[in-house]
Structures are given as structure tokens and as C-alpha cells.
């Protein structure tokens, strides 16, 4: 198995990416990782000339400030585009990047392409829950608007991922809504509800945003606009809460002593709400795994993203998604007749 890793994207590139790759090839004996980036920066970070860590040299990079479509078309020798093209040309089974999200989605669509039967891809991160199991949220911005049939496809893809990669039997699939009653919501959610109810997965109905971190379900589907709001709210709330705790608990000498005694516990609490161990956000609906690692990913987070990509390839997630979507499409057509 071979994974292409863009080592020029993200806040901690290339050190975090190379460190993670070294750890990953030790953990997975059949894995080769192509490090795509500036060889002058990468080579000193490698312990030796490991044949399982080849370098694809380039000095061109897509910046976070670049316009996605323009950057992908003009910067054809950028580390991100070259990494994605490794998949297109059959030299890699999956690709990972911590760079410009929009550019990665554009490159994935342009070079990897959609699975037949998938109308719109979905960007899907795992978010933390209090029970430490996490939940998959899709879409969080690949498409701002959605149609009912898109949400059905998101549910099929999310269900497949949670079963095959996260090992959850009969994942609970929920529809993000403003209330739990079947008749709640806007035109999109009202039309999507019966499609999801008849889908080939365990649909539990509508779920409210306030219940997500409590582990209300394993897969949450919504349009990209709503999903992005949830994603940013969760990230922002977690950060604000820890800042508040730090401020309030360091006001007095006594409270500072208490913090010192409970430092380990606070670290554990922070870890519960961290996304790092869940890997990156998969761009579901493409012919091969294309995964966006968080821009601030450190080595441990990049490593978990590599492990995520490895499992997706190993479990043939894209093949199963293609089969399940084809079944659902055929079933809908037969009912329409």
C-alpha cells in the first residue's frame, strides 16, 4: 500500500509530517509513504535512505491565501497537486494534505474524480464526544447547499466509514435539525427525512445540535452550510471554555495550587475534547481516499490521519460506498416505477 503525503501544508510542516510518516511505516509493515515537498527540508529529517519513504521533490506550494481553483490550475507542480496526481496515476492509494481545504477539494475532484452515482462529495471530520467515541459530521463545507438525495448519499457514505474504519456495528445515523419531531425543520430536512428513514442503515431520526457532544448518534448528516457552523461552533466553544477555566483558576494563589495538583486531570479533560486522535476530514464520494488533516496538526495528529487512510484503503471503503450507493439508486428507481 502507498500513501502520498503533502508535507508542505500546515503550521508544523514538514517536521510533523515526516515524524508521523517515520512512525507510520514502522507501525504498518506493508505501507510506503511518498513524501511530497522540498527534498532539502525533508532529507535532514529522515534517519536514513528508507525505500519506504521516497521523496517526490518540489518547491512549489499552494498557500492558504490562494484562490483554490486558480491555484490548482496554475500551480501544477505544487506539493498538493503532485500528491493528488500520485493517486490519479496509480502510484498511490490515498492522499493526505494539511494545506488549503478548498484547493484540496478542487484537486480531488479534478484529478481523482467522483464515484459513479455520487452527486456531490462531502467533507467529513470526526468530532469529539464526552464518551470519547466521537461522531462523524457530513457535510461541513464541500457543498454549501444540498438536496434530499445528497443527504441520503452522505448517510450511506458515513455509515460505511463508521462500520468499516471505526468498527461500529449498526452506526446510529441522525439528521441535524431544530427539533427531534419528524415534521420539524426546513424544506430540505422535511424532504430528506423519509429518504433516510427508508435507507439501508440505522436511522434514529432528527438530532439537535445541543445533543451532539453527548454522543446522540454516530453519523450526523446535514448540508455544508449547517455542518460548517456546527464544526466552527464546537471548535470555538471548546477553545473558549479552556481559556475561561485557565483564567478563572489562576486568579488566586490557592487556585493556582489547585491547578498544579489537578494538572494531569485537566490534561485528560482537554484530550477528551481534542480532534487529534480521530484523524482528518475525509472527502467522501471520490474514487480514492482524499483526506484533509487539520492545518494545526502536530505529528500525532498526522500519524492518526495516516492510520485513517490506511484503514480506508485496507477496508476498501470507496468500493463499498460505490456498491451501496448503486443499490440505493436502483432501489429508488424501482420504487419510482
Swiss-Prot record:
InterPro entries: FA_synthesis (IPR003664), Phospholipid_synth_PlsX-like (IPR012281). It comes from the Bacteria. It holds the Pfam family FA_synthesis. Its main location: cytoplasm. Pathway: Lipid metabolism; phospholipid metabolism. The keyword Repressor does not apply. One of its GO terms (cellular component) is cytoplasm. Keywords: Cytoplasm, Lipid biosynthesis, Lipid metabolism, Phospholipid biosynthesis, Phospholipid metabolism, Transferase. It catalyses: a fatty acyl-[ACP] + phosphate = an acyl phosphate + holo-[ACP]. It is an enzyme of class 2 (transferase). One of its GO terms (biological process) is fatty acid biosynthetic process. GO terms for molecular function: phosphate:acyl-[acyl carrier protein] acyltransferase activity. Its EC number is 2.3.1.274. It is found in: Cytoplasm. Catalyzes the reversible formation of acyl-phosphate (acyl-PO(4)) from acyl-[acyl-carrier-protein] (acyl-ACP). This enzyme utilizes acyl-ACP as fatty acyl donor, but not acyl-CoA. Belongs to the PlsX family. PANTHER family: FATTY ACID/PHOSPHOLIPID SYNTHESIS PROTEIN PLSX (PTHR30100), PHOSPHATE ACYLTRANSFERASE (PTHR30100:SF1). Homodimer. Probably interacts with PlsY. This is Phosphate acyltransferase. The gene is plsX.
Amino acid at each position: 500500500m502507498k500513501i502520498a503525503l503533502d508535507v508542505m501544508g500546515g503550521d508544523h510542516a514538514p517536521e510533523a509530517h515526516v515524524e508521523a510518516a517515520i512512525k507510520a511505516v514502522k507501525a504498518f509493515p506493508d505501507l510506503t509513504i511518498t513524501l511530497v515537498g522540498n527534498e532539502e527540508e525533508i532529507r535532514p529529517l529522515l534517519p536514513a535512505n528508507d525505500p519506504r519513504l521516497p521523496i517526490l521533490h518540489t518547491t512549489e506550494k499552494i498557500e492558504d491565501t490562494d484562490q483554490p481553483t486558480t491555484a490548482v490550475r496554475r500551480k501544477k507542480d505544487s506539493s498538493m497537486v503532485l500528491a493528488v496526481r500520485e493517486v490519479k496515476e496509480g502510484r498511490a492509494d490515498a492522499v493526505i494534505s494539511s494545506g488549503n481545504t478548498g484547493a484540496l477539494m478542487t484537486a480531488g475532484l479534478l484529478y481523482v474524480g467522483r464515484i459513479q452515482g455520487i452527486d456531490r462529495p462531502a467533507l467529513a471530520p470526526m468530532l469529539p464526544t464526552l464518551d470519547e467515541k466521537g461522531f462523524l459530521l457530513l457535510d461541513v463545507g464541500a457543498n454549501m447547499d444540498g438536496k434530499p438525495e445528497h443527504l441520503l448519499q452522505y448517510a450511506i457514505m458515513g455509515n460505511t466509514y463508521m462500520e468499516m474504519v471505526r468498527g461500529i456495528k449498526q452506526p446510529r445515523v441522525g439528521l441535524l435539525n431544530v427539533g427531534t419531531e419528524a415534521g420539524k425543520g426546513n424544506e430540505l430536512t422535511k424532504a430528506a427525512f423519509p429518504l433516510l428513514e427508508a435507507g439501508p442503515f440505522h436511522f434514529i431520526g432528527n438530532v439537535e445540535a445541543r445533543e451532539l457532544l453527548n454522543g446522540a448518534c454516530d453519523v450526523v448528516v446535514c448540508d455544508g452550510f449547517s455542518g460548517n457552523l456546527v464544526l466552527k461552533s464546537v471548535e470555538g466553544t471548546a477553545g473558549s471554555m479552556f481559556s475561561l477555566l485557565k483564567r478563572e483558576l489562576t486568579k488566586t494563589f490557592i487556585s493556582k495550587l489547585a491547578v498544579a495538583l489537578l494538572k494531569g486531570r485537566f490534561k485528560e479533560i482537554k484530550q477528551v475534547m481534542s480532534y487529534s486522535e480521530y484523524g482528518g476530514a475525509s472527502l467522501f464520494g471520490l474514487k480514492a481516499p482524499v483526506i484533509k488533516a487539520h492545518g494545526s496538526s502536530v505529528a500525532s495528529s498526522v500519524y492518526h490521519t495516516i492510520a485513517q487512510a490506511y484503514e480506508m484503503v485496507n477496508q476498501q471503503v470507496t468500493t463499498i460506498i460505490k456498491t451501496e450507493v448503486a443499490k440505493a439508486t436502483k432501489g429508488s428507481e424501482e420504487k419510482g416505477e
